[in-house]
Amino acid sequence: MKSNLRYGIRKHKLGAASVFLGTMIVVGMGQEKEAAASEQNNTTVEESGSSATESKASETQTTTNNVNTIDETQSYSATSTEQPSQSTQVTTEEAPKTVQAPKVETSRVDLPSEKVADKETTGTQVDIAQPSNVSEIKPRMKRSTDVTAVAEKEVVEETKATGTDVTNKVEVEEGSEIVGHKQDTNVVNPHNAERVTLKYKWKFGEGIKAGDYFDFTLSDNVETHGISTLRKVPEIKSTDGQVMATGEIIGERKVRYTFKEYVQEKKDLTAELSLNLFIDPTTVTQKGNQNVEVKLGETTVSKIFNIQYLGGVRDNWGVTANGRIDTLNKVDGKFSHFAYMKPNNQSLSSVTVTGQVTKGNKPGVNNPTVKVYKHIGSDDLAESVYAKLDDVSKFEDVTDNMSLDFDTNGGYSLNFNNLDQSKNYVIKYEGYYDSNASNLEFQTHLFGYYNYYYTSNLTWKNGVAFYSNNAQGDGKDKLKEPIIEHSTPIELEFKSEPPVEKHELTGTIEESNDSKPIDFEYHTAVEGAEGHAEGTIETEEDSIHVDFEESTHENSKHHADVVEYEEDTNPGGGQVTTESNLVEFDEDSTKGIVTGAVSDHTTIEDTKEYTTESNLIELVDELPEEHGQAQGPIEEITENNHHISHSGLGTENGHGNYGVIEEIEENSHVDIKSELGYEGGQNSGNQSFEEDTEEDKPKYEQGGNIVDIDFDSVPQIHGQNNGNQSFEEDTEKDKPKYEQGGNIIDIDFDSVPHIHGFNKHTEIIEEDTNKDKPNYQFGGHNSVDFEEDTLPQVSGHNEGQQTIEEDTTPPIVPPTPPTPEVPSEPETPTPPTPEVPSEPETPTPPTPEVPTEPGKPIPPAKEEPKKPSKPVEQGKVVTPVIEINEKVKAVVPTKKAQSKKSELPETGGEESTNNGMLFGGLFSILGLALLRRNKKNHKA
């Protein structure tokens, strides 16, 4: 009994121990698996390349007993399959040597995996793209000075975009254009601080939210900053001062505007932008035409400009000096300057070049940096005054061969000991100025001796001009509860114009004057006549005030100014001072200095005042006494008794075949004073002279043909007229009209023509009084009727009856239905990236990751094989050496880096863990079986 009991107790202990041991094995293996997975979950994968924000210059990852450095060089293979966990470069002063690690070493750190993603490349911009399993990393090249500056302070290259690109919702309205510096010309001279201006008018569509953005791109021959080192564009503000959108420059020629909260509750958004664009001297190095383009979406605004540059100042022998301010940093008070010195193969000796800040200098500053380069290239120097001095194939540094001295105000003095007369020289200056000064001016002076001690003395000045940009926008509040929905306003515009009617009529044209009183005085003047017909010449003077102004300078051929020039008899000598008018600078203020070019002469401005009186000019000419006999009666007929007529008849000489001379003066309050002159010759046919006064000019008809002749002198017409001859004069624009053979020819002249020859028919001269002119009739007894109405003059050939009908009903233009806009396909929005918290100062225990949506399992991410890397000794800090040999690459904004929230990946020990759990489970089952058996035995 006791034996069985002991056996049962032993079996009871064995069963309980088996159950306990199996449970511990299962629990222990589960915790080991979780810990193993947590060790590898410190890698954040970037889905696509994005612009990296530079972080601190030195960072370390520390654990309890060890220091972990993560190093990464800048040369990666395009076929690499490993995605680096982070791009951190760590540098400490205690590092005894440099270590280059081609791969990223991942170590165990007591930090959450999300913290590691906050570390970025310091000093180098890296673009990362990950198509499937291939990762290619290309560093962005920076100059050495920029890399040094990054170690001192944080530099942010580009703000990451979080909104949607809504460029397709921006409509460029009519009136958007690019205008030149001067309105009346397309010539732009950057050396005179001239620039072009982009004027945009935008209308934005619906559905724009805060954070959305749009871009537009400039052509490579312009940029937005001029000589300024700042890259900025104005904000778009509403009329009440609220910011609608902020602007930034991406790269060099891409402008982006990002909308703010103002647009949330607005509709019908519009904006206008006025942005100064400066000619880029690095790309437009020579004079000529340039096509400036700005592209927004599918809309391009462009214009061609003629770019000109100043050639500098030169003496009589061709020696030239030129210069240009290249960059200006108002924050640090620094600027740089290029200067050209061209000997032009002249024998110069003791050549000295000095540079001095004449306005805006800052006393007590450090010495500037001055470098002298000899141009050894085969091409000419850039007319834009720019040089890529690091090109050793074109420029040779000869600074050490010169004698260089500095003064206390940032100036320099440079002596050319061995001047190569066949080469040109470029001087690069980098110095300081007072950024609080209102003006900045830099002067370059060249002095040298020719043979026989003739001198070359040249001065060139460069100044700075400041420009400002502006932008404004507006919008209407959205209606929260609209009264009418789906209503589209329809704007209709009707324009009606009467049709233009043209008619031609052949035959007699009658003009009738209405019976308004006309008072005028008409005087005749005598002019010499040649031939057989010497008649009275009428001259009419209008009572229009004549303004006359002239300059009373004596001994001068100039109209406005007198320029006195004084020349030195010393060939090649003399002081020549020229100011290069202004260099562009982009700033919010508009103050600055404008200077002009001055050569070796004096310009005197005439300050005299001249007064010219405008008086009425009256001309009265009397005819001389006339002698002769008239063969036949002379009649004077005056009608209607409503006018006063003074007619002095002279003696008629010659033979008139028809013997009767009639003067008929017609009605309606006309005061006429006229005198007849000599009339001679023979008239074999009927001749009529008709004159209307539409614009005080006669019209002559010869043989039924209309001839319009324009000339300024008096023509002479000779010959015989065998048929009916008529002369008609209209005064449409003080020009006579001649008709010959049915062809219309317009002739302008200012004086009355002379008509000579024999007239075999009766001659009739008809003149109406519409414009203060008398009416004469010779050789006929028929009166002349003048009728004038308000109808326009009608001329031409009509062989049949003509009816003119005028329709006064305006044409009805049917409204054009509005064409619905088909919106373009929207671009795929980029999902926002959650912010990654910064790394804490102290390590925290790992926290298991919980899926956001329970019930939906997340497949584990595929683990990429890790290549072994060089081990790092514990307790030592390594310093990476970064070799940057690639050019600066523009950063393309893409999707932000974000951590993949997925299940923990499988580790290498998962299979052994499962076996252990199975073994523990079997132990527990065995223990339970023993306990059950013991219980049965105990009952038995």
UniProtKB/Swiss-Prot annotation:
- Bias (Basic and acidic residues) occurs at 764-774
Q: Does the keyword Signal apply?
A: yes
Show where the record puts the motif LPXTG sorting signal.
904-908
The signal peptide stretch is 1-36
Region Disordered, as annotated, extends over 36-111, 676-746, 764-878, 892-918
Q: Which GO terms describe its cellular component?
A: extracellular region
What InterPro entries does this protein's entry cite? Adhesin_Fg-bd_dom_2, Adhesion_dom_sf, Fibrogen-bd_dom1, Fibron_repeat-bd, LPXTG_anchor, SDR_Ig, YSIRK_signal_dom
Could you tell me which residues the D- repeats occupy?
681-718, 719-756, 757-795, 796-814
List the biased-composition ranges (Polar residues): 38-92, 792-802
Give the modified residues of type Pentaglycyl murein peptidoglycan amidated threonine: 907
Sorted alphabetically, the Gene Ontology BP terms of this entry are:
cell adhesion
Q: Where are the WR repeats?
A: 815-828, 829-842, 857-870
Bilayer disposition of the protein? Peptidoglycan-anchor
Which keywords does the record carry? Cell adhesion, Cell wall, Peptidoglycan-anchor, Repeat, Secreted, Signal, Virulence
- UniProt subunit comment: Interacts with host PLG; this interaction provides active plasmin on the surface of bacteria cells. Interacts with host histones.
Q: Please provide the record's free-text comment about the domains of this protein.
A: The fibrinogen- and elastin-binding sites have been localized to the N-terminal region.
By what name is this protein known? Fibronectin-binding protein B
Question: What broad taxonomic lineage does this protein's source fall under?
Answer: Bacteria, Bacillati, Bacillota, Bacilli, Bacillales
